[in-house]
């Protein structure tokens, strides 16, 4: 369900317009705690995101030594009308979090060997771009297979219920 201009998809209920969803992260990692972070963007990046483009595949967040959280390898395509004022498509972008949240992320990454993974990027009601990030632990191959089996069973169960009822 997207707008007529082919822009970001609107999710029913909470008023968020989802730009990008990192479905691969939920398969490859078991997600623990999640955080909502603002993101520092250039004007051409925001306009490009308004068209509903952008990808979080292979993106990750890292805590720098200066205590900042950076979103690395997220893809935001160039905005054609920006001409010479365009941006780099995969540049590191600063995530905006409270100091306590940054300290919690840094501690989990250092002590427990967890990874900070972006889960989705969306527009709020006020038009701000937010990124939902999660503390993640990598899954083993057996866990991934188990996830596939569960999804398959849920699909089969739904199919049987549709046919029967």
Curated annotation (Swiss-Prot):
Name the record gives this protein: SsrA-binding protein
Function: Required for rescue of stalled ribosomes mediated by trans-translation. Binds to transfer-messenger RNA (tmRNA), required for stable association of tmRNA with ribosomes. tmRNA and SmpB together mimic tRNA shape, replacing the anticodon stem-loop with SmpB. tmRNA is encoded by the ssrA gene; the 2 termini fold to resemble tRNA(Ala) and it encodes a 'tag peptide', a short internal open reading frame. During trans-translation Ala-aminoacylated tmRNA acts like a tRNA, entering the A-site of stalled ribosomes, displacing the stalled mRNA.
Species, as recorded: Parvibaculum lavamentivorans (strain DS-1 / DSM 13023 / NCIMB 13966)
Top-level taxon of the source organism: Bacteria
Gene this chain is encoded by: smpB
InterPro entries reported for this sequence: SmpB (IPR023620), SsrA-bd_prot (IPR000037), SsrA-bd_prot_CS (IPR020081)
Family statement: Belongs to the SmpB family.
Places the protein is found: Cytoplasm
Intrachain S-S bonds: none
One of the record's GO cellular component terms: cytosol
One Pfam family matching this protein: SmpB
